[in-house]
Swiss-Prot record:
Record-linked Gene3D superfamilies: NAD(P)-binding Rossmann-like Domain
Descriptive protein name: D-lactate dehydrogenase
Taxonomic superkingdom: Bacteria
SUPFAM superfamilies: Formate/glycerate dehydrogenase catalytic domain-like, NAD(P)-binding Rossmann-fold domains
PROSITE patterns: D_2_HYDROXYACID_DH_1, D_2_HYDROXYACID_DH_2, D_2_HYDROXYACID_DH_3
A molecular function (GO) term: NAD binding
InterPro entries attached to this UniProt entry: D-isomer_2_OHA_DH_cat_dom, D-isomer_DH_CS, D-isomer_DH_CS1, D-isomer_DH_NAD-bd, NAD(P)-bd_dom_sf
Amino acid sequence: MTKIMFFGTRAYEKDMALRWGKKNNIDVTTSTELLSVDTVDQLKDYDGVTTMQFGKLEPEVYPKLESYGIKQIAQRTAGFDMYDLELAKKHEIIISNIPSYSPETIAEYSVSIALQLVRKFPTIEKRVQAHNFTWASPIMSRPVKNMTVAIIGTGRIGAATGKIYAGFGARVVGYDAYPNHSLSFLEYKETVEDAIKDADIISLHVPANKDSFHLFDNNMFKNVKKGAVLVNAARGAVINTPDLIEAVNNGTLSGAAIDTYENEANYFTFDCSNQTIDDPILLDLIRNENILVTPHIAFFSDEAVQNLVEGGLNAALSVINTGTCDTRLN
């Protein structure tokens, strides 16, 4: 019987993975561990592997997989910056991802957390906790219909996000290296700088690559409309985090919502309540009253989880049976 290892299993995924295995007559083994130099030897007798990595995969893993006859790694996220695609190709390993598993879920998160900032929820909560129930200018907001929203990256998720904002009556502008001119609700701009210069809300939906690395840094923040809010539900590396904190502290941004953080791998998805966090930048984010931090959960809905579980397993099985899959990256 074909055997697939399901690394990075969370409690809510296990039954889904095992049901898929039973339905497809595949022996699926679940493990809470991630694929690494320490766990790769577990794959000696397996035909395929799916995992959900967040940190960089060590280069030593690729030749090990090749030596065991494994031809693929099925990543259960849209992001794939944790893999060296050329090194994987050298060792005849196909890397796949899941480019679309519930774009509406991430779009809904992006809009809802932006609304928390626009409606001054962090300030309101602080005042209520202090038993200050007065109405005052620090908690006065503006309706979204009077705002301009910049969507940076107009793929499936960015497009879904922009459509929601258009439903509020907002003016929606966008930037993408490959514009989708069928998006009638959105006005494209030639550059990121041009897209954000008049935006009250900036929503990031770009992949992590050499062109987007620290795209939003001090130089980019110089182009931001004073008092704008920024939401990053894309990849952490898109933002230079110290520069973001500075932009919030000096009033360039009135607030930010961060669902992905460039150094998140050691913390996000783990319970760190009984340990010391040795990351002063992450602590600065968490402690900042005008920054909302969530642990990479924009995608987290029942629909998305099922699509990720089944998508990863389907991709692994496809490579095992046919030598390729529809979502291969190299």
